UniProtKB/Swiss-Prot annotation:
Alphabetical keyword list: Ribonucleoprotein, Ribosomal protein, RNA-binding, rRNA-binding
Descriptive protein name: Small ribosomal subunit protein bS18
Gene Ontology annotations of biological process type: translation
InterPro entries: Ribosomal_bS18, Ribosomal_bS18_CS, Ribosomal_bS18_sf
Family the UniProt entry places it in: Belongs to the bacterial ribosomal protein bS18 family.
Single GO molecular function: structural constituent of ribosome
Functional summary from the UniProt entry: Binds as a heterodimer with protein bS6 to the central domain of the 16S rRNA, where it helps stabilize the platform of the 30S subunit.
Underlying gene: rpsR
Induction summary: Strongly expressed during exponential growth, decreases 2-4-fold in stationary phase, part of the rpsF-ssbA-rpsR operon. The operon is induced by DNA damage by mitomycin C.
Length: 79
């Protein structure tokens, strides 16, 4: 039988972390918050994985890049 499995649980819609918590400003110095949106390899996680909306994804990307330049976040993970 060709094709994928039918049935099962429906995927839950991801909600934006920032809009649900009322965060309007993303600070590049808040490293603990930024680490939630970076993979273990140091890559910025895409919107389809995190569920953030486009506006906050752009702000998040700028904050992560700024934190990397200020040496608050690594560019790659140290393995």
């Amino acid at each position: 039988m060709a094709g994928g499995r039918r049935g099962g649980r429906a995927k839950r819609r991801k909600v934006c972390y920032f809009t649900s918590n009322g965060i309007t400003h993303i600070d590049y110095k808040d490293v603990d918050l930024l680490k939630k949106f970076v993979s273990e390899r140091g890559k910025i996680l895409p919107r389809r994985v995190t569920g953030t909306n486009a506006k906050y994804q752009r702000k998040l990307t700028a904050a992560i890049k700024r934190a990397r330049q200020m040496a608050l976040l690594p560019y790659v993970s140290g393995e």
